[in-house]
């Protein structure tokens, strides 16, 4: 048997700040091999965003194929912790350390659950990357390519992101909004403010374009998604002088969008809007993920039933929050996210309630048993 608390502690002790691995994958691989999994590891990418350590582990054969996906990397701890963020410390019923809830605790809980299953029908796999908190270029995307090439794509996937809010089990994510980042640059001609006829100020046209973008009504949301929103995140001219008309004005924005849109269509909308007010401006865009949803059905129902059995709660099915690697996995199969409470993720003194670790392992065990016993789930 595997103790989820002990395994979480060993993982926290690996300072795997993205994209560093710091031994985390070796800890995971050793635990999985000890309970009969075949483990495949490979690195992808180059500096500065890599190399990234990735792991795929599999046990069993035939269908159904159930996968658990997660990440071993963590965000930088920052300063001001009560204790060393990479020396796991128990204070009362809380285990403190970077990654406790996001998401080394969930990985440990799933491995502990898998250890209890013994011989089972079907196939269980784990898809673990060290590149979720970073650019997400060489992690789950590379793992998906690897699985496709070997015919190892799952039928269902559970992502262990910390979806719970106030109590373990109060929220499950069945979808996520898409995200697109955009950079706008308007070039003028630098000059003295007393001689505007000898210069071309790039700011007024950019301001008009931004005002028009801020006024856009993208949609009203729908049954499962809140309205899409566009946020201007930076406006900059790099001008510290009081008597100089700047040569260039720049802005950056982000759009979080629901399944009423595709990222490319929103990029085109922004380009058209900017062109109307700042014809000389250039627009660059990066779509980090499209929106997706796994409609409520058998998969979310059995997850909800397992949560109810262990916690007594009926979870809310939600699409709120930021992006996750579920956006990539949703292209393979139905995907749902469920994990620990997220109140301290990315914060100083990140901590998980120890009883929640054990309860999460119980929930994961029930989910996997149900899926493997009912191929049509």
From Swiss-Prot:
GO terms for biological process: diaminopimelate biosynthetic process; L-arginine biosynthetic process; lysine biosynthetic process via diaminopimelate. It comes from the Bacteria. It is an enzyme of class 3 (hydrolase). CDD domains: M20_DapE_proteobac (cd03891). Zn(2+) 1 binds at residues 71, 102, 161. Pfam families: M20_dimer (PF07687), Peptidase_M20 (PF01546). SUPFAM superfamilies: Bacterial exopeptidase dimerisation domain, Zn-dependent exopeptidases. The keyword Mitochondrion does not apply. Belongs to the peptidase M20A family. DapE subfamily. This is Succinyl-diaminopimelate desuccinylase.
């Amino acid at each position: 048997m595997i103790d989820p608390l002990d395994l979480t502690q060993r993982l926290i002790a690996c300072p795997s700040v993205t994209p560093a691995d710091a031994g985390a994958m070796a800890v995971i691989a050793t635990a999985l091999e000890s309970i009969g999994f075949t483990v495949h590891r490979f690195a992808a990418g180059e500096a500065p965003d890599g190399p990234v350590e990735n792991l795929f582990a599999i046990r069993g054969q035939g269908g159904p194929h159930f996968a658990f996906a997660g990440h071993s990397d963590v965000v930088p701890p920052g300063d001001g912790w009560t204790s060393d963020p990479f020396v796991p410390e128990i204070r009362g019923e809380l285990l403190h350390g970077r990654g406790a809830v996001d998401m080394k605790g969930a990985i440990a809980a799933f491995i502990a659950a898998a250890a209890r299953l013994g011989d089972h029908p079907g196939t269980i796999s784990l898809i673990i990357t060290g590149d979720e908190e970073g650019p997400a270029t060489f992690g789950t995307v590379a793992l998906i390519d690897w699985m496709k090439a070997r015919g190892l794509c799952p039928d269902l996937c559970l992502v262990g992101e910390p979806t719970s809010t106030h109590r373990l089990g109060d929220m499950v994510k069945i979808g996520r909004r898409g995200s697109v980042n955009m950079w706008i640059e308007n070039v003028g001609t630098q000059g003295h403010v007393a001689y505007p006829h000898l210069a071309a100020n790039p700011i007024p046209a950019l301001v008009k374009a931004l005002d028009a973008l801020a006024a856009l009504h993208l949609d009203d949301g729908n049954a499962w998604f809140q309205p899409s929103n566009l946020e201007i995140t930076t406006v900059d001219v790099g001008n510290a002088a009081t008597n100089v008309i700047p040569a260039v004005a720049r802005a950056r924005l982000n759009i979080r969008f629901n399944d009423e849109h595709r990222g490319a269509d929103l990029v085109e909308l922004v380009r058209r809007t900017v062109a109307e007010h700042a014809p000389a401006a250039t627009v660059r865009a990066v779509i980090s993920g499209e929106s997706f949803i796994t409609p409520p059905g058998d998969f979310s129902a059995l997850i909800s039933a397992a949560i109810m059995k262990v916690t007594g709660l009926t979870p809310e099915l939600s699409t709120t929050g930021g992006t996750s690697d579920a956006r990539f996995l949703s292209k393979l199969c139905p995907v749902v996210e469920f994990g620990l409470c997220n109140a301290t993720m990315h914060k100083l003194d990140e901590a998980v309630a120890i009883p929640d670790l054990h309860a999460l392992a119980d929930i994961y065990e029930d989910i996997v048993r149900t899926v493997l016993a009912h191929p049509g789930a």
